């Protein structure tokens, strides 16, 4: 006859199983699962109840093209807007245009650059909280900025060598010093007009080269760096060389980068990273729940840039500290498993609920 099976075992077998997600609090109805169970999802569930594997508000949406990733994201965003959350979103395909207009949000067309939306890569993001500052860790603000600038240069020019990148960091620090900025600086009262631009960095490079009458190894590195930086202050100046022109007091900010996605690969990657870094700087107000949405995240991870992937992983790790939840959208898990960024990709997944 075979092995007898108790009736409780039979009752637990497919297709008789039934499950659902009914999060308490300010939840959004996402739909039903394969067994017909209702899915009521509260991204900030950890704030009201402890639950296994729900210890932060970070989420990743995966799916092939046309599978409904953006539709699901917009459902979640609508719920957060109604619940009074601050929204910061990077929108590569202009899919948030209607919802932004409906709810009175602000759209910044970064693809046009210049007066339409300039983000100064050298502006410092103050992402040290009060506890870190009390512990004397305020210097990490500038340290993280320098790391981000090195990541930016790797996106802008993947062929940049380590010696040129190290020299770039030294030159940037020298430029900051000319503006009264060092590791002990209190940035809390700084405005966008207080920071140097790439024009100032380029001037520092030229000044150091002119001070070296003879050809040396250091001068050779500086000259190679000059060639790398020059396009940033000439043909690409409307994207990278100027003071930040974007207001920072919006409750619903969308960065439209559709026009940017058609630009040259390295320029697109550098701009995407620069936008993400600035967007993270808008998510540091602990008095309100904030959502940071990053669509087409594979653009950042597909460039084999460890520093850039590490920045996204740091955002995932630090988001909870600032009452921020992330929505990272990409097409497939393999986007996070490239050998060059697999450590950071694992951290991005591990820090999602």
Positions of PLM-derived features:
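Hydrophobic positions on the alpha1 helix immediately C-terminal to the Walker A/P-loop
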Residues: 72
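Post-Walker A helix-loop "phosphate-sensing" segment adjacent to the P-loop in P-loop NTPases
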Residues: 79-88, 103-106
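Conserved lysine of the Walker
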Residues: 69
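P-loop NTPase motor domains
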Residues: 2-39, 45, 92-105, 110-112, ...
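The conserved Walker
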Residues: 65
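Conserved P-loop NTPase catalytic core
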Residues: 344-353
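Hydrophobic anchor at the beta1->P-loop junction of P-loop NTPases
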Residues: 61
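Sensor-1/coupling segment of RecA-like P-loop NTPase cores
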Residues: 319-336
């Amino acid at each position: 006859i075979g092995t007898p099976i108790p009736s409780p075992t039979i009752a637990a077998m497919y297709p008789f199983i039934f499950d659902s997600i009914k999060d308490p609090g300010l939840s959004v109805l996402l739909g039903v699962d394969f067994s017909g169970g209702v899915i009521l999802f509260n991204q900030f569930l950890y704030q009201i109840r402890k639950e296994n594997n729900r210890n932060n508000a970070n989420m990743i949406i995966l799916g092939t093209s046309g599978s409904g990733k953006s539709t699901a994201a917009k459902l979640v965003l609508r719920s957060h807007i109604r619940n009074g959350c601050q929204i910061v979103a990077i929108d590569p395909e202009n899919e948030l245009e209607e919802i932004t207009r409906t709810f009175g949000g602000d759209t910044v067309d970064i693809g046009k650059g210049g007066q339409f939306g300039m983000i100064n890569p050298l502006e410092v993001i103050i992402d040290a909280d009060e506890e870190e500052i009390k512990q004397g860790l305020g210097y990490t603000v500038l340290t993280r900025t320098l790391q981000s600038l090195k990541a930016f240069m790797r996106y802008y020019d993947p062929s940049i060598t380590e010696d040129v990148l190290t020299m770039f960091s030294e030159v940037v620090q020298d430029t900051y010093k000319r503006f009264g900025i060092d590791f002990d600086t209190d940035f809390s009262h700084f405005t966008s007009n207080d920071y140097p631009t790439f024009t100032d960095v380029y001037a520092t490079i030229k000044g150091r080269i002119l001070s070296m009458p003879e050809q040396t190894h250091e001068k050779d590195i500086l000259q190679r760096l000059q060639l790398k930086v020059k396009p940033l202050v000439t043909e690409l100046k409307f994207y990278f060389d100027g003071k930040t022109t974007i207001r920072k007091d919006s409750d619903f900010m969308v960065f439209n980068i559709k026009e940017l996605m058609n630009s040259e690969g390295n320029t697109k990657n550098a701009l995407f990273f620069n936008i993400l870094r600035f967007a993270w700087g808008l998510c540091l107000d602990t008095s309100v729940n904030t959502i940071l949405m990053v669509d087409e995240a594979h653009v950042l991870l597909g460039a084999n840039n460890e520093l850039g992937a590490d920045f996204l992983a740091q955002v995932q790790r630090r988001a909870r500290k600032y009452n921020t939840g992330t929505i990272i959208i990409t097409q497939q898990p393999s986007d996070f498993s490239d050998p060059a960024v697999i450590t950071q990709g694992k951290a991005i997944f591990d820090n999602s609920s």
